[in-house]
Regions:
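N-terminal amphipathic/basic leader segments beginning at the initiator methionine
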Residues: 1-22
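Alpha/beta enzyme core
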Residues: 2-3, 14, 26-32, 38-322
Length: 322
């Protein structure tokens, strides 16, 4: 049948009908809010390039998380650490008194209904800003795996619910899974940053986390933005190594990749709505060029419509307004 028998506008005639037939709806259970936790006390440093976000010491992180839960009902967070000191290998992140495990233990003492995802990478903890040990001017894959595995065990011991390796080393999921299992954490899931692209959208995050590389870039381990078949190979490898969830990062420029991954694999798909995507919205809204709340809603809906089961987003704290 076609027009005039079929009139597609009939199901758009009022808000109640539109809501009834809506195919995609974002809700609080879909969202994870990232936080940046910094060593020290009474620190609440505004992140200039990410309005409304802060570097928070543990004592300031706790009320911020409480506010997130109370206002929005979002009870899932992702933690990134900003340490007091760094080293050549990122070994500082493996210590039990490192900033993220310290924050996790503090949060565990306050919140019983909070899901904590711990990012696993070395870039915040190395003096050179790369994601692993440098040998001959490049990140050495296999020696880096040992650090990532040790870091994962430390965070699991501290109480992390989910381990999320973001380094893009080959074999990291298998190394982490083996280390977790050997230390009694066989029920701790791995959320792998499987298709993490060498993107220009990470700029504000690197300012926030102090993780910009001191030389070169990350194109020898993060993915080429031109490739999508490669993303499927990365996802397949991570699943075979034991990943429980897989991630595509960034989200907006890679909706096609999210869709391909969801269509190809029967596994939960996470999408990271990254700092540059967030900051573009904030900048445009500050200049009066867009309706901020409408655009945020549209972005999150498009990510879920593409196939994401879970969305990591700095907009999570604004969810109550959407």
């Amino acid at each position: 049948m076609s027009y005039p028998i079929t009139r597609l506008r009939r199901l758009r005639k009022n808000a109640i009908i539109r809501s009834m037939v809506r195919e995609t709806e974002v809700n609080k259970d879909d969202l994870i809010m990232p936080f940046f936790v910094i060593a020290g006390q009474n620190i609440r440093n505004p992140i200039r390039s990410m309005p409304g976000n802060f570097q928070l010491s543990v004592d300031q992180l706790i009320p911020e998380v409480k506010d997130l839960i109370d206002r929005t009902g979002v009870n899932k967070i992702l933690l990134f650490g900003i340490p007091e000191s760094k080293d050549e290998h990122g070994h500082v992140a493996c210590r039990e008194d490192a900033i993220v495990p310290t924050a996790i233990r503090a949060l565990r003492n306050v919140f019983s209904d909070l899901l904590i995802v711990a990012d696993i990478c070395n870039c915040e903890y190395t003096t050179h800003g790369h994601c692993g040990t440098i040998v001959d001017g490049d990140v050495h894959n296999d020696s880096t795996l040992k650090t990532l595995a040790a870091q994962s065990v430390t965070l699991a011991k501290a109480g992390a619910d989910i381990i999320a390796p973001s380094d893009m080393m080959d074999g990291r999921v298998a190394a982490i899974r083996r280390a977790l299992d050997e230390n009694g954490f066989e029920n701790t899931p791995i959320m792998a940053y499987s298709a993490k692209y060498a993107s220009g959208f990470y700029g504000p995050f690197r300012d926030a986390a102090g993780s910009a590389p001191k030389f070169g870039d990350r194109s020898t381990y993060q993915m080429d933005p031109a490739n999508s078949d490669e993303a499927l190979r990365e996802v397949r490898e991570d699943i075979m190594e034991g990943a429980d969830m897989v991630m595509v990062k960034p989200a907006l420029s890679y909706l096609d990749v999210i869709h391909r991954v969801k269509s190809e694999f029967n596994i939960p798909v996470v999408a990271y709505n990254v700092s540059g995507e967030f900051s573009m919205v904030k900048a445009a809204a500050a200049n009066g060029w867009i309706d901020e709340q409408r655009v945020i809603r549209e972005i999150l809906t498009s990510i879920k419509r593409a196939g994401a089961d879970v969305i990591i987003t700095y907009h999570a704290k604004e969810f109550i307004n959407l």
